[in-house]
Amino acid sequence: MAGIGRVALMQEPVAAVMSVMKAHQIDGTFLIYDLGGGTLDIAIAQSTAGRVSLLSHGGIALCGGRDFDRRVRESIVKPWLTANFDLPEDFSIHPKYRRLMRMAALAVERAKIELSAKDSATISLSEAETQCADECGSEIYIDCDLTRDDFNQLIADCVDKSITAAREAIQKAGLSPFDIERIVFI
């Protein structure tokens, strides 16, 4: 058509890992596990003498960091707010509380990152950060705890689905888990 040979389309994380494997002459069969903000991408690639082949790929939409954050907001932050402030039932979608929910999303993400090094974290926002009052005029703040165990429990089904997706990608490549020599987490 435009003088371009056959082109293979692939997901960006898969292309990046394949480029690194080729540049560094790393041989083996790899499972690439890319848990992004909104999706999980899984690929099985094989590298031999600088030649990289994509054997299979798969993944899960709506299984990423933002989904984990949403679960924490829905299960921990929203109940804490309704227990401590006079808020309408639909406050999380109410325009008056839009800033509060955006700020809460950032606080949840900070706490989630903190959990990578600690067993618990505090999801906190001061009154000055939220710049929001409840229906009675009380200034709203957030100060609730998130433990690693609570977080793991909230995302357990997504983790289980990701393991299933990895097994399916391995099977689709015609391999067994014992054939995977390296796992690359992105």
Residue spans of the language-model regions?
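Oxyanion-binding/catalytic loops of NTP- or PPi-dependent enzymes
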Residues: 1-186
